[in-house]
């Protein structure tokens, strides 16, 4: 999965759940800028966040 796909999936899941980038950043303990970069494909989330994201978004 490429960066764009990861970002689109993350963005879509966040919108379905009805939360902001700021709210997700608080859950994960990262900056809002990090969430934005993940969603825009500029960066990947560290692999350690994937299990947390999976649990959070079910």
What do these predicted regions represent?
Residues 1-16:
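A short, Lys/Arg-rich alpha-helix, primarily the initiator
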Residues 8, 18-19, 45-48:
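Residue-level signal for the short linker/turn that defines the boundary of a DNA-recognition helix
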Residues 18-37, 52:
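Short alpha-helical DNA-recognition segment
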Residues 40:
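Short, conserved catalytic or interaction motifs in soluble domains
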